[in-house]
């Protein structure tokens, strides 16, 4: 009996390395798949090398059927439909016009299709039907790199990379000098904080975990400002951050709207009060559009959302 027990105990120790080998093999396969993606990224031409970029463009022309550069002008959606799955359409015939140099807002309850629409405009959600034109050029016919050179997207969870503040900001403008970096930080009211640390060499942990949510978002917007594109899409860029950061970001959006085309997607309607035009989505359909004043007076979908939010935000203030 003792011998059998000993064999059983030894057998468990014998098979343990085999089980570990299987786990290590799985990890190795994941690593190989990830390394392939990294190598493909490293093989992309570096901006600034004209000869390489021209060669890359020539190859891309052949691969994509001679796509076109991004136009500079209005962004127009006509009868826009989009589905993540074949039988589940998210956007149902949306029609919007974003005038060049305007401040346009897209609002609606959660799940109405706001972020899906912004992803279509950025070229991330492909396979739409209908028409989306940027400066007169159909979105599906525009080079992806040309689109990125003309439209900057800022979401609520923009990513900061491990390194330094300088490293992260230079991703927006690789040739920017320190003066431009400080200017961008000043615009988002982070310059004083960064100077109190180690300046532009201040360390940034993975995903910016050593900063608050509001600080991370401000750093991301500073990087976006350095990118300096004609169009900026703010997709819930002020959600889940402190009130002070939200107010500072909205001041910056208002300032940008004087020189850039701004598309602001927000669940908080107070942030879109000064928009030139507000589009209201419900379940993937456009139900209303107009200025804040016009929509409130219409007493429809927007007015209902506005009144509900105002009641919540003002609750208890009268008792103070």
Regions found by a protein language model. Name each.
Residues 55-320:
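ABC-type nucleotide-binding domain
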Residues 1-7:
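Membrane-water interface of transmembrane alpha-helices in multipass transporters/channels
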Residues 40, 47, 170:
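Conserved E/DxxT/N motif and adjacent residues on the DHp alpha2 helix
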Residues 14-41:
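Cytosolic ends of transmembrane helices, especially the final helix of ABC transmembrane type-1 domains
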Residues 8, 15, 148:
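Conserved catalytic core of two-component sensor histidine kinases
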Residues 23, 27-30, 46-47, 83-86:
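An intracellular "coupling" helix at the cytosolic face of ABC transporter transmembrane type-1 domains
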Residues 24, 31, 41-44, 275, ...:
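Amphipathic, soluble alpha-helical interaction motifs
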Residues 44-46, 125:
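Two-component histidine kinase transmitter core
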């Amino acid at each position: 009996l003792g011998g059998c027990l000993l064999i059983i105990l030894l057998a468990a120790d014998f098979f343990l390395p085999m089980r570990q080998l299987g786990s290590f093999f799985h990890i190795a396969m994941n690593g190989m798949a990830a390394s392939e993606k990294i190598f493909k990224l490293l093989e992309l031409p570096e901006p600034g090398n004209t000869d390489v970029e021209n060669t890359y463009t020539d190859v891309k022309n052949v691969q994509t059927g001679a796509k076109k550069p991004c136009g500079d002008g209005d962004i127009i959606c006509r009868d826009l439909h989009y589905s993540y799955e074949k039988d589940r359409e998210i956007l149902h015939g949306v029609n919007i016009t974003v005038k060049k140099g305007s401040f346009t807002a897209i609002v609606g309850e959660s799940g109405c299709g706001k972020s899906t629409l912004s992803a279509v405009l950025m070229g991330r959600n492909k396979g739409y039907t209908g028409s989306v034109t940027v400066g007169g050029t159909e979105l599906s016919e525009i080079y992806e790199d040309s689109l990125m050179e003309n439209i900057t997207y800022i979401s609520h969870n923009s990513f900061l990379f491990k390194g330094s503040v300088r490293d992260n900001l230079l991703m927006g403008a690789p040739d920017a000098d320190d003066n431009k970096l400080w200017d961008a930080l000043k615009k988002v009211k982070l310059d004083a904080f960064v100077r109190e640390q180690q300046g532009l060499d201040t360390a940034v942990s993975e995903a910016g975990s050593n900063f608050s949510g509001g600080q991370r978002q401000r750093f991301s917007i500073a990087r976006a400002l350095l990118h300096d594109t004609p169009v900026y899409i703010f997709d819930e860029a002020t959600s889940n951050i402190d009130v002070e950061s939200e107010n500072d970001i909205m001041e910056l959006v208002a300032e940008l709207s004087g020189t850039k085309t701004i598309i602001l997607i927000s669940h908080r309607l107070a942030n879109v009060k000064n928009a030139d035009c507000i589009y209201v989505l419900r379940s993937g359909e456009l139900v209303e559009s107009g200025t804040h004043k016009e929509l409130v007076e219409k007493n429809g979908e927007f007015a209902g959302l506005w009144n509900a939010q105002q009641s919540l935000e003002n609750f208890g203030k009268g008792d103070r």
